[in-house]
């Protein structure tokens, strides 16, 4: 990953880098990889995340249809 530093503004470059890493999911992946996660626990977590995403999508869809 590459971020350009303009006008010696390192703080702005760090913010841009952090935003890119956040979008890529690097911080989340690092947090998950700190400790070993049993395959059964990983499977349950991923299933719960999928259910959460589906509910969120259904909520948004229902809200959009209600507004129309």
Curated annotation (Swiss-Prot):
Gene Ontology biological process terms, A to Z: translation
Keyword Ribonucleoprotein: yes
Gene3D superfamilies xrefs: Ribosomal protein S8
Gene Ontology terms for molecular function: structural constituent of ribosome
Keywords from the named record: Ribonucleoprotein, Ribosomal protein
Keyword Transmembrane helix: no
One cellular component term from this protein's GO annotations in UniProt: ribonucleoprotein complex
Family membership noted in the UniProt record: Belongs to the bacterial ribosomal protein bS21 family.
NCBIfam families assigned: S21p (TIGR00030)
PANTHER family on file: MITOCHONDRIAL 28S RIBOSOMAL PROTEIN S21, SMALL RIBOSOMAL SUBUNIT PROTEIN BS21M
Protein name: Small ribosomal subunit protein bS21
Protein's organism: Paracoccus denitrificans (strain Pd 1222)
Protein's gene: rpsU
């Amino acid at each position: 990953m590459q971020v350009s530093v303009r006008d010696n503004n390192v703080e702005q470059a760090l913010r841009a880098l952090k935003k890119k890493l956040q979008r890529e999911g690097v911080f989340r992946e690092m947090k998950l990889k700190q400790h070993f996660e049993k395959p059964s626990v990983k499977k349950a977590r991923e299933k719960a995340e999928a259910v959460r995403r589906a509910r969120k999508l259904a909520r948004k869809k229902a809200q959009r249809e209600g507004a129309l």
